[in-house]
Amino acid sequence: HQPDVVLATPLADCGPYQTDYTKSAQRLGLPVGFVPFSWDNLTNRGLIRIAPDRVLVWNEHQKREAVTFHGVPEDRVVVAGAARFEDFFAMQPSASRADFCARAGLDPSRPILLYLCSSNFVAPDEVSFVRRWMCAIRTAADPALAPSGIIVRPHPAHPEPWHGVDLGRVENTTIWSDEAKIQADPGLYDSLYHSAAVVGLNTSAMIEAGILGKP
């Protein structure tokens, strides 16, 4: 292989292997670009140990983070947008509301609330929290809110806490997701598209919710 350029992501991580790629590429005279995969890659994962030739950040906030926290020369940092979400912007729902609700086991006549679960690092005991939240929804004084359908979508990297959890005593609820994909996930898109509102603690899927204009 004789590449023209090497692109690395997430690079600013806990492990060193992508730093080795950067060192090797630069030794061979190949330009190296770094594309942050997620919004928090420059603030809570690790350091950029060797500055790439270009850092293609999402926005001015990430540009400041790259320069301030990682010491990347400002002239190497380019605001290029969030490449990860390009495909998501172009997506369309794969199912009608009736078909989606039939798959998820929900009443299509009711509005849907989507709960997006977080990683174990953020929410180590999310099951008990979600149960309390669902109880608050069902006992709400608002007659439109209380009977809403509820989808609990486990975090794709941390589904284990929801294995075997039974929400059967709470009507019109489901723990549901299609086979998860890292990006351009059609199951996530459909869940967001057909929901009236989205709830979560701290997960990148809130960005996808914002793309679809969901409160």
Residue ranges of model-derived segments:
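Active-site and donor-binding regions of nucleotide-sugar-utilizing enzymes
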Residues: H1-S94, H158-P159, Q183, M206
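Redox-cofactor binding/interface segments in oxidoreductases and associated redox assembly factors
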Residues: A8, V57, Y115, V152, ...
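Hydrophobic anchor at the start of a short beta-strand
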Residues: V32-G33, I150, K214-P215
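Conserved catalytic-core segment of nucleotide-activated headgroup transferases in glycan assembly
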Residues: F85-D178
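Donor nucleotide-activated moiety binding/catalytic core segment of transferases
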Residues: A157-I207, I211-L212
